[in-house]
Amino acid sequence: MTDYKATLNLPQTGFPMKAGLSQREPARLKEWQQKQLYQKIREAFAGRPKFILHDGPPYANGDIHIGHAVNKILKDMIVKSRTLAGFDAPYVPGWDCHGLPIELMVEKKVGKAGHKVDAGTFRKKCREYASKQVAGQKSDFMRLGVLGDWDNPYLTMDFTFEANIIRSLGKIVDNGHLQQGFKPVHWCLDCGSALAEAEVEYEDKISPAIDVAFPVVDVADFVARSGIEASAPALVIWTTTPWTLPANRAVAVHPELDYVLLSGELSGVARELLVAEALADDLVTRWGLENVTRSAAVAGSKLEMLALQHPFLEAQVPVVFGEHVTTDAGTGLVHTAPGHGVDDFMVGKQYDLDPISPVLDNGLFREDLPVVGGLHVSKANEPVIEALKDSGNLVKLAKIEHSYPHCWRHKTPLIFRATAQWFVSMDQAGLLPRARQEIDKVQWLPEWGKARIEGMLTDRPDWCISRQRTWGVPIALFVNKETSELHPQTPALIEQVAQRVEKAGVDAWFDLDPAELLGDEADQYSKVTDTLDVWFDSGVTHYCVLDQREQLRAPADLYLEGSDQHRGWFQSSLLTSLAIRDAAPYSTVLTHGFTVDEHGRKMSKSVGNVIAPQEVWNDLGADILRLWVCATDYRGEMSVSKDILKQMGDSYRRIRNTSRFLLSNLSGFEPATDALQPEQMLALDRYIVDRALQVQAEIQDLYDGYHFHQVYQKLHNFCALDLGGFYLDIIKDRQYTTQADSVARRSCQTALYHIAQALVRWMAPVLSFTAEEIYENLPGERLDSVFLAEWYDGLFALADNADMGRAFWDKVQDAKQAVNKAIEGARAAKLIKGSLSAEVVLFVDAEQNALLQRLGDELRFVTITSAAVLKPLAEAPAELEDTSVAGLKVQVLASDHAKCARCWHHQPDVGSHAEHPELCGRCITNVEGDGEVRHYA
């Protein structure tokens, strides 16, 4: 038996079937770095229209997690797809480097600033720690295949950046948005300082729970407002912090709640007590109120500014409205001490109530106070309760175990205490109304993002930007000791400070002798030692990064972060940008969801469902992680697990194997000399290129709209259905058996080349490592990297009136699927071994006959059978079942003819040639003659 293998055009490629991503990807990263790929992209696209995606800075602490990976991969896909679209799309990554978590890590190593080490040394250690964290995270982000200016990232702790933060504060001062005021903060009596939220732990605590009556001062006013007859009504509050009652300045009701007056006897004493109607039954029982009558309801909205008597002090307090008032517990009325609670403080600001906190830094009440003067907070509950008993205003005393804020260091209960702070005012210079206006100009994706940030800005309180921390950018201001006014030369002073910080970092401020800048005035001014909220640091990146770097600009085209950033970075960026430039810092804001496991549960070490990106790239490769990010609809929760990633691996193999088939069949093809013009190509080849053009247009639109999961679907379906399920199977015979330089084969190779060029670009933003590997295996001239390319422009369309256009081939595909199903049935019934051992008879109506007869003898190459015959539908045997195609029935017969040793078709002329008794006539023509001629398939 002669071996005809050498006469076939068998596929050849250096592109391996086994991806080996976890081994190959690091080498590819090294290559990109050595060739300075990012800089080459910048040079190649210089002068093109800009697209600026501004990177929200992750915090420089700890290893990156799966959420970080999602965020960076999404950004990378956008930047790469924008580059393909012809934009100059620089990507400058950044890190948030100041703040409490870093302080806590450094404290564990060197002790607290001002105790075991001086503040300057502590800041130096913080800077060193943050630098190490940045280095580790940077390495991990690069490992994901993210291209960016990794050699020049922005760090909020860089001296120049710190200086520009101070300059941005100066602009906010210039524009009239900064004010000094009081705000309640968590205060640790043991630390003697304010605590940030991250330093607060919640533990169970037993506290006194008291119901307290606030008698109405003007009964006639109450009766007139409520329509309720009463002689000595009182409004009742419930509190677990009796010690705060000396600072009470109001009682809050909800304007939309209804209230009733309960008249009855309590321990033999007649009482008239106003409470929320929804809680009345519970309170009657809890208090043991007897002989109760209940009034008609009165709306809370009618009680505003009703005067009440303080329950044990010589003072009157008003009724105010509070949206925070609920009927979840208590009485539906809330004791309001603006100096001791955030909600109370907000209400107090609306009503201009004094946010007094009579508690000193050391936890002692001021000496001049009645009842509690000179006492420590921890000792004040009992005398307050006794005073309430004496005045007859204690309705009920009980104990309650509840969750209460504690100091994370000392494990002791905290108090809320109003202290002097610095604020960005929402209304002083109209910042909040401007924010609402500007929101309408921004595109929010998904659309619900707009409603979310609008809701968060509704009645937003002033932004407290001051922190009593060591590791942060200073609020570099001088305040007059007598008037509390800022120095009149503040703008010039801020610039002088910024210039010093640019050279020496924030220590330049903390070490500064005010006389160096103020001269003889130094004694009249205090140097502010507070630091800025880290949300201010990251919030002004539009000024410190976009405005300062030549290749960037503000506003950015896109901000992209997790859905929690409507409260965080999106908002701090918007407010600071409006305060500085009176415009939003972004044109579009895109939000992604959080990662959960396959059951929708949050990632948790205790549950054991954490997927670490480091494990994924070490095991499966970063491209698998990237494919998962692309395939998942990121606008909701993103499910990930080992099983899900394994499924992604299967999808990846489909795309890789399809690409490998294309490359292996381009062996020996030189585009410059071998490619055919569209009019020279076979009909099927022209169709598949037209189909690729159609898919490319869809994919480009999907990338432009950030619909990445649909990009994945289009990419996967084109590989699996258009190519794998139709075109590639059909062309194998022509590709392998026709003469190497025949029109039939070169037509096919031309189509494969165009498809490969397009396909590699479609996948490049997603499967970045794999795309580069494919690209370097393409024949012909290439750029230095696929990431220097733009969308492929070599695809072409079929004319709308083409003889064998889209509609024709779509119907042929339907018929082929019907044939495939019939062949599978025959194979299952062991009638045939494979499709080439079969002959099919297609019983067709007039419409199907007109369609399929146009392929002539080449119909068998489409059905991939040894023969394909058309007969009238009326002649179909009765036992033949209908197919999925109207007017088509399929009969599968085992071929009686001998099998050609070269093409494996069963043909009647096998054996008719004496020199090649094992070949069919077609193969003899291809081996020794002029070669067969194909027209369609």
Curated annotation (Swiss-Prot):
PROSITE patterns: AA_TRNA_LIGASE_I (PS00178). L-isoleucyl-5'-AMP binds at E561. One of its GO terms (cellular component) is cytosol. Pfam families: Anticodon_1, tRNA-synt_1, zf-FPG_IleRS. One of its GO terms (biological process) is isoleucyl-tRNA aminoacylation. The keyword Transcription does not apply. Binds 1 zinc ion per subunit. It is found in: Cytoplasm. A motif ('KMSKS' region) lies at residues 602-606. A motif ('HIGH' region) lies at residues 58-68. Its cofactor is Zn(2+). It catalyses: tRNA(Ile) + L-isoleucine + ATP = L-isoleucyl-tRNA(Ile) + AMP + diphosphate. GO terms for molecular function: aminoacyl-tRNA deacylase activity; ATP binding; isoleucine-tRNA ligase activity; tRNA binding; zinc ion binding. PANTHER family: ISOLEUCINE--TRNA LIGASE, MITOCHONDRIAL (PTHR42765:SF1), SOLEUCYL-TRNA SYNTHETASE (PTHR42765). Catalyzes the attachment of isoleucine to tRNA(Ile). As IleRS can inadvertently accommodate and process structurally similar amino acids such as valine, to avoid such errors it has two additional distinct tRNA(Ile)-dependent editing activities. One activity is designated as 'pretransfer' editing and involves the hydrolysis of activated Val-AMP. The other activity is designated 'posttransfer' editing and involves deacylation of mischarged Val-tRNA(Ile). IleRS has two distinct active sites: one for aminoacylation and one for editing. The misactivated valine is translocated from the active site to the editing site, which sterically excludes the correctly activated isoleucine. The single editing site contains two valyl binding pockets, one specific for each substrate (Val-AMP or Val-tRNA(Ile)). Belongs to the class-I aminoacyl-tRNA synthetase family. IleS type 1 subfamily. This is Isoleucine--tRNA ligase. The gene is ileS.
